[in-house]
Amino acid sequence: MSAKARGYVALMKLRVVELLLITTVPVMMLAERGVPSLRLIAVTLVAGTLAAGSANTINCYVDRDIDQMMGRTKRRPLVRATVTPTEALTFGIVIGIVSTLLFGFLVNWPSALLADGAIAFYVFVYTLGLKRRTPSNIVIGGAAGCFPVLIGWSAVTGTVGWAAVLLFAVVFFWTPPHFWALAMKFRDDYAAAGVPMLPVVASVQVVTRRMLGYAYAMVAASLAVAPVASTGPVYLVAAVAVGAWFLVESHRVARRARHGEDPRPMRLFHMSITYLTLLFVAIAVTALV
């Protein structure tokens, strides 16, 4: 693969996309109460990857000025000039259009509209509107990362059900503690770039208290899924177990911050990925039993 081709792939941030798509297939299975057709799953995943890649690519285009100031992002293709800004913007728009067409003609148009809404929300509301203006950027803007749940449900049913809305809420409340843990680690990067992430503008005690609050909201939403989606005992036991695990770790981070110790936020960051994966695996299992 040429350097430019690798640059285009890097712009899509496929490692982030993987995390988003972890939620999609289990939700499709829950909506189907079984395994949907492999064709539908494949098209939904490909189109979803292109939609998320489109949003990420355009985000890189907009943020190329601050990416060069941050150690975590200074090796991105636009900073290293592997891909030109015009090429990146064109690529982002084109794969977004391809995503829309795949969803519209091979899945359904409600899913296409949801994918377009996710791209627009991430680019215009988060990247252009909130990211450099308010510490609430990731709280509101993080909603873009919840759309795969709605898209997965819509791909199977053509509508958005209450179970999908509650799972959207789970991911929505999961996002702040997940992302703020990372932002605590790279606080100096965000400060140097002038991005007012909460860990930049608030004390570590304030940040960890808010993370804990969102963790409780996330667990509450995950438990509410059980009666609404009629998931049965397998999901409920899993939601209680992994939810308790997440809350214990969130309390540990808050307690260490309160005592003036290093909260070691990356431990919670990595654990949050495991939490989300296990919760949605439980949803997939529920759909099969």
Swiss-Prot record:
UniProt record, GO biological process: heme O biosynthetic process
One term of GO molecular function: protoheme IX farnesyltransferase activity
Topology with respect to the bilayer: Multi-pass membrane protein
Ranges annotated as spanning the membrane: 9-29, 40-60, 89-109, 110-130, 134-154, 155-175, 190-209, 228-248, 269-289
Main location: membrane
Top enzyme class: transferase
Superkingdom as given in the UniProt entry: Bacteria
Pathway(s) where this gene product acts: Porphyrin-containing compound metabolism; heme O biosynthesis; heme O from protoheme: step 1/1
One Gene Ontology CC term in the entry: plasma membrane
EC number: 2.5.1.141
Places the protein is found: Cell membrane
Coiled-coil stretches: none
Keywords of the record: Cell membrane, Heme biosynthesis, Membrane, Transferase, Transmembrane, Transmembrane helix
Swiss-Prot/TrEMBL catalytic activity: heme b + (2E,6E)-farnesyl diphosphate + H2O = Fe(II)-heme o + diphosphate
Keyword presence, Transferase: yes
Other facts: Carbon 2 of the heme B porphyrin ring is defined according to the Fischer nomenclature.
Function: Converts heme B (protoheme IX) to heme O by substitution of the vinyl group on carbon 2 of heme B porphyrin ring with a hydroxyethyl farnesyl side group.
PANTHER family linked to this entry: 4-HYDROXYBENZOATE SOLANESYLTRANSFERASE, PROTOHEME IX FARNESYLTRANSFERASE, MITOCHONDRIAL
Name of the protein in its database record: Protoheme IX farnesyltransferase
